[in-house]
Amino acid sequence: IKFEKKEKLNDIIKSLPFNLTNAQSRALNEVIDDMVSENMMNRLVQGDVGSGKTIVAVLVLALSVLNGYQGALMAPTEILARQHYESLTQTLAPFDINIDLLVGSLTKKQKEKVLEKIKNHETDILIGTHALIEDNVEFDNLGVVVTDEQHRFGVRQRAKLSTKGNNPDILVMTATPIPR
């Protein structure tokens, strides 16, 4: 997928209640460069807890939506998925970006509603746990897959989420240093 840089992304960045750090800006620019290239992105963002990896992911997901695609963010626990949901909703709601949460504790009826919305592209960004890789989760037009705490998922689990789109760009985040 070849994305285009969108001016509206700058509006989202300007609306943040803080300025991006130099490291966040550099990471974001590198990821965006990957996204606008002809090649599929498969990138790791590594940083300490609290270093701002999540805001980079939020902006990457927003760029996907601004280009007409959907985004997915998979977290290893329901608590973390809910935190991401609240963070993304707070940041992106003023920009008419629809975000839904898919986790194990939803009722059957709630899950069915979310699944229908994601399939019909009424949901722009879906956040959840392993529930995202269930067979019944069908995206209309998945452009970016973000996996938080990637070391908590198996290789097959991460790969399965990316098969729900047509070669979506992949961003994985970790606070755990990767041994060389």
Predicted regions: what is each one?
Residues 82-85, 139-180:
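Post-DEXD/H (motif II) to motif III coupling segment of the RecA-like Helicase ATP-binding lobe
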Residues 70-77, 102:
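Conserved RecA-like ASCE P-loop NTPase motor core of nucleic-acid helicases/translocases
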Residues 105-126, 133-142:
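Conserved motor-coupling elements within RecA-like helicase/translocase cores
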Residues 68-72, 98, 121-125, 141-144, ...:
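Loop/turn-to-beta-strand initiation segments
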Residues 1-51, 55-72:
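Pre-Walker A segment
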